[in-house]
């Protein structure tokens, strides 16, 4: 019985039906096996083999078949050798195509329809069966689709008019080389499609120069997706653009989130990290972020998206035999069902190779390898806990089946970072007998060759060691203490993401012996600070781990601090004088934890940055009485808070040390619990940058800001600053299109043919007029690009606000003050990353260097604009941050809001 493609389609359908019924846990392995069979059925190679078989049995072996029934049938001998060299070929042009393909060939797609019954076949095919004409597809004609060199039968290509919309029911499939056909044979061209072939882009006439993300066109697949806009919009978020690249310097527009229940999620084809090339007929390559957002907003109810995505990396399967040693198997894993290491991928990945372990000694297992099985236990589509259990229950001899990527991860944004991050939601377990395999290590997150979760104090060498650091924008990235009475210089703090942290060679408790051959064993604090300051870019440090000496030093500092705190209370300054009460409302510009302030004269009151406090008694120099003001009203609880004077005095005492970063104001988000005083002068130094400065009494310290309550009759603009702001902005507009919008910017650039004045831009004909308006502060932000001015005007923001929508602004922190001056008080929210690791966890496509720069930019933003922030949010996940932002906007929307008062404290 001949094998036909319809039979394959039917078998595939039955397999998929059966797979959908396997929902029980015990069916997981069977389901996985069936999926492998389905993948084989859907592969291009399998389809090609079916084509060969069908051609051989139906055509070459079918003697009665002939071209013209009026002529005598000539038997066709079985073909055993195909001569490809003798095949005729022509370039694809409108002249070479059959009559049915004669319209201008500008766009191509495969026919993806079932084989039609004879009565539905066109007369041209039934009455005049053409001989096999093979068309050579040149690179020139199809380079935008994919670099194809081969032969494609005419029946596989059909033209589409340039403006014709491809209906959602017609999936796009790729142009692939058809099988070479003998010139002398009669061929009935099959019209049955390939089974679920990978998609290819339609409308390539307007996409002459595709942009690549770390790859060539052959690395990508393309798809056209038609969505119907729902009540909550299209249901996805985007990031990127020429003004704010999402990945490195790539200005492409990326899908960053598929909103559950939205149009995109219900359709099921759009994926996170897809790159949008076009929205309907609007090209969104090399456009600003706002331009892409506008294209999506203006696309109407039926939206055609042309997207590209990276093809899955080919993998090499191999088996590795490991023999457990004292350190176990010696590697860490991450991922699993419900705990994906890579978005959309449930696989188990190797994230760290532990030095000296079995995997390290064997040398075959690498970071980024995917674990498929351990001994006879399958690790595909399992939870993280199941994978850990399988690895834990192995004997001394362990056989690992792994998939190794054949392409280098350096070109892949999904490269698993070499980290062990205890604060990460993605569980990362060490496969070693000494660690609890079901739990995350509790040591601080570190970038280093050997995880600090693996090395105990007894395993760290106590011998002097040489460390070479290269000074970065944050300096050397550590603090020092000591230098009094020859007690030595110790490292007291390692800045996350700084050079010292990234090297992994220095740790808290190290004693610094020398810096660039300058002996610091008997140095004072000032001498050590000067040596570090003047050490240049490359700094050679000889350090020795001395945790016992450092612990004694810490105890001494703690005792001294307690003495000073007690002295402050007993001196009489701790009592509240109530003879001249003064009442006011203030906004807190720092976090306060009453449990960390031992000088409190009575019950204290906790508060966070941005909280509104009603100070009911501000007569005392050191302590005030206050109540918290919530959106629901004023709290009944009265507590004591430090006065403005006390906060500033304590902070200045802490800052009265040698600092190497003249712009650093300390951590303005909170008042640390280790604030010093005169007796602690020069106890801590920060080896952060190049300049030394003593903090005088003029040093600006953030404490409280006086505020008044005001009623507003407009919807407040929203400015979000910090990492992941684009994703949050996009999510707000996508989820609440009726509540959030963007304003139309101004430009002196000439209008293009397809642009509409007032919709795409406000086109300003006079550059002099726009420059004058900028000077008169009519713009909250403006700049120049390609000799054209661009800017966001106060009036544009006001127009959106008066329509009852929050105007989402993608501007700098300077715009906050300008809006306040214009009496448009924005809700300004700063997303404060917890660490470099926190940034990488929320955006796995970032490299360590990109995450470091993002973290540094965030710190600089906080230093410059803290006093202008309405609120500061932190979270372990983007979802957590997004929910906090929504709550803050809801609470701060008005109509009664707190605005800065003109009076001074």
UniProtKB/Swiss-Prot annotation:
Pfam family, one: PDZ_assoc
GO biological process, any: regulation of potassium ion import
InterPro entries given in the database record: DLG1-4_PDZ_assoc, DLG1-like, DLG1_PEST_dom, GK/Ca_channel_bsu, Guanylate_kin-like_dom, Guanylate_kinase_CS, L27_1, L27_dom
Primary site of residence: membrane
Residue ranges of the region described as Disordered: 420-449, 663-694
Membrane topology field: Peripheral membrane protein
Ranges where the L27 domain occurs: 4-64
Post-translational modification summary for this protein: Phosphorylated by MAPK12. Phosphorylation of Ser-232 regulates association with GRIN2A. Ubiquitinated; by MARCHF2 which results in its degradation.
Ranges of biased composition (kind: Polar residues): 420-445, 683-694
Disruption outcome: Mice have craniofacial abnormalities as well as a cleft palate. They are smaller than heterozygous littermates, unable to feed and die within 24 hours of birth.
Role description: Essential multidomain scaffolding protein required for normal development. Recruits channels, receptors and signaling molecules to discrete plasma membrane domains in polarized cells. Promotes epithelial cell layer barrier function via maintaining cell-cell adhesion. May also play a role in adherens junction assembly, signal transduction, cell proliferation, synaptogenesis and lymphocyte activation. Regulates the excitability of cardiac myocytes by modulating the functional expression of Kv4 channels. Functional regulator of Kv1.5 channel.
Protein name: Disks large homolog 1
